[in-house]
Amino acid sequence: MSLLNRLFGIYEPPKAVELPPICDPVFGDLTWDSQYRWWQGHFTSPSGEEFEITVDAPSDTETHPTEDQKKVFQAVVPRLAELKMLSVRDYLPYFNADGVEGEPYTEAELSVEVVPDDIHIASDLDVTVSWVETPNELLGGHALTARVSPDGEANIGLEG
């Protein structure tokens, strides 16, 4: 950043950094997205569900996933089925009240209708897991989400 830009507070976005793909022992094969400054790949859960995975660059100077990011991810993986159930259970009363004609959905029926979308590991160590609807568009283009803080607390919501 030039001296004049610094004096007048003019922000220049960091230059795009291109990085070669990596094979991380925890996250698997990842490719770098310089636009979003994150690593992206695919993850298969213990139950066989396929998620996209994105891992934020920890800082402007450090780009590779940190040990702490790996630890919070590894702590969330065994909870994926529980988090999906909590997300469905939280949303079901609103869904049945507003979005269903005829018989209301059961928890099991709605659970089948939502499919894995993304697991995002943020630089602040929050992990957000999201599920989207099947082609039936039951969620109206939204996603059920579970945001898990580094201490393991889960906040459930609907986004999009």
Regions found by a protein language model. Name each.
Residues 41, 84-88, 129:
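Short, hydrophobic/proline-enriched secondary-structure or compact coil segments at domain edges
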Residues 26-76:
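Contiguous hydrophobic, core-forming segments of folded domains
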